[in-house]
């Protein structure tokens, strides 16, 4: 028993002088492990008389528990001290200004496209899409555009070969829709289009939204009402809207749509060239030949179509004076639209 008391005293002394958790684990193994000092004492019980074994075994267990309790307490103490030291070294000065997180935002053209789609979705139009690489038939022939039309010239259209090209408008989507389903049809067709043009107000690639409605009894009055309500909803103003006679091969009659200048409210400024009006889109009643090419009876069904440039509307809505700013990827510019 004297040997047992001495082992316990040694173990407790070693624990008290230990300043490291790893060293503490080594002490535990040395005294309480499978081959530890106190474990070896327990194995000597077999050498004692049977009547002494329970008493001595109980004493050994008490000694082991005492050492284990001191080990646990010291481990908790050392871990707490280590945590406190780490927290002191890594503490955060909450009085420092925050760094903040930069948040992204939708591109102004994307915002404009979504706004246009929402305006028409609310009145029953569906969004239709089609390929950007088109064939000559869907881009020109099916839209009543003859071979001598200026739009077919090489300097206006990007051709891959004699039959394939980058679409110059989203009207081919309207043709494909009319070919695949019978009226009533109510669609808007947003997408990228391509033309050989580049200056302050034109880009070789830009976004266009065209609309088509085909049904029985459709009139130009329906077209005017639709366009007027859309423009007032888009700009959130009671704008004056006017329709000027024009010509498009795929509509008859055709019109250009002007709105009261959103910059000067019609008083005349540099943007509207002192006229008080801004051209925003083209429209008209679908030409009977276009309906026939898509196997729709023009005697039974009528339709109207319209088309607008998304960048043009974005420039007017946000007061941007150079179309190319939309494609420069300048974060100083784009950050204004978050």
UniProtKB/Swiss-Prot annotation:
Cofactor binding summary note: Binds 2 magnesium ions per tetramer.
Alphabetically ordered keywords of this record: Aminoacyl-tRNA synthetase, ATP-binding, Cytoplasm, Ligase, Magnesium, Metal-binding, Nucleotide-binding, Protein biosynthesis
Primary localization: cytoplasm
Cofactor: Mg(2+)
Reaction(s) the record says it catalyses: tRNA(Phe) + L-phenylalanine + ATP = L-phenylalanyl-tRNA(Phe) + AMP + diphosphate + H(+)
E.C. number: 6.1.1.20
CDD domains: PheRS_alpha_core
InterPro entries in the record: aa-tRNA-synth_II, aa-tRNA-synth_II/BPL/LPL, Phe-tRNA-synth_IIc_asu, Phe-tRNA_ligase_II_N, Phe_tRNA_ligase_alpha1_bac, Phenylalanyl-tRNA_Synthase, tRNA-bd_arm
Keyword rRNA-binding: no
Matching HAMAP family: Phe_tRNA_synth_alpha1
Similarity comment text for this entry: Belongs to the class-II aminoacyl-tRNA synthetase family. Phe-tRNA synthetase alpha subunit type 1 subfamily.
Protein known as: Phenylalanine--tRNA ligase alpha subunit
